[in-house]
Amino acid sequence: MTSLKLLKEKAPLVICITNDVVKNFTANGLVALGASPAMSEFPADLEDLLKYAGGLLINIGTLTDENWKLYQAALKIAEKYNVPAVLDPVACGAGEYRKKVADDLINNYKLAAIRGNAGEIASLVGIDVASKGVDSAGVDNIDEIALAANEKFNIPIVVTGEVDAIAVNGEVVMIHNGSAMMPKVIGTGCLLGAVVASFIGLEKGQELKSLKTAVLVYNIAGEIAEKRPNGHLPGTFKVEFINALYEITDEDVKEFKRVK
């Protein structure tokens, strides 16, 4: 069974502790894809939810001291119940405090994957690239950044940009799909982190397969959305992207995938 069919069959509960800007978009994107999102940030909820979860997303976009403690508590409980956790270290290259939080979560808690743009992942491994807040300029050595992070942390890495790189156990795969409209809609990268959290726990020991499917499904849905009427307009693209996530099939992935 393919990873996409498995996701739709299992409808994994994904606990999304994410930033305030993208919660609605993230929840709707996961529902469209076939997962079951829970956006609770109430500490007393964590154990009750995580014991049944198929994935956990920690996105540090709207960072506070209280949220840092929430991330730590969630990751501790996720490890107790063997729930795969994905970290999205938003803008960790933009300031020392964010870098400190990201380093803490990576070094002291169990993570199943890290997803970030080239600037964010590069900052985690000390590679200097052009970065501006949550955005990252076009980077030529995205594969090297992914491999460096995978080697340093021994965690599967997804680095996104004009081309995406996935590094698992020293192997790197490049995904050339995607839409130029994605950066024009706030939250597309953050939703990808949640999609990764939805796929990563579906098949034990098949992290590379799961991550490839997650990124391909996501990026090809973006291509489909852009080609629809008025898909070149951000508002229409946002709606059509959710529609495409709902409608995308394994046949679409097989036909349109561009992987190296």
From Swiss-Prot:
Annotated residues for binding of ATP: 115, 160
Enzyme class: transferase
GO terms of biological process kind: thiamine biosynthetic process; thiamine diphosphate biosynthetic process
Domain of life (superkingdom): Bacteria
Catalytic activity: 5-(2-hydroxyethyl)-4-methylthiazole + ATP = 4-methyl-5-(2-phosphooxyethyl)-thiazole + ADP + H(+)
Record-linked SUPFAM superfamilies: Ribokinase-like
The protein's required cofactors: Mg(2+)
Record family assignment: Belongs to the Thz kinase family.
HAMAP family cross-referenced by the UniProt entry: Thz_kinase (MF_00228)
Designated name of the protein: Hydroxyethylthiazole kinase 1
Organism: Streptococcus pneumoniae serotype 4 (strain ATCC BAA-334 / TIGR4)
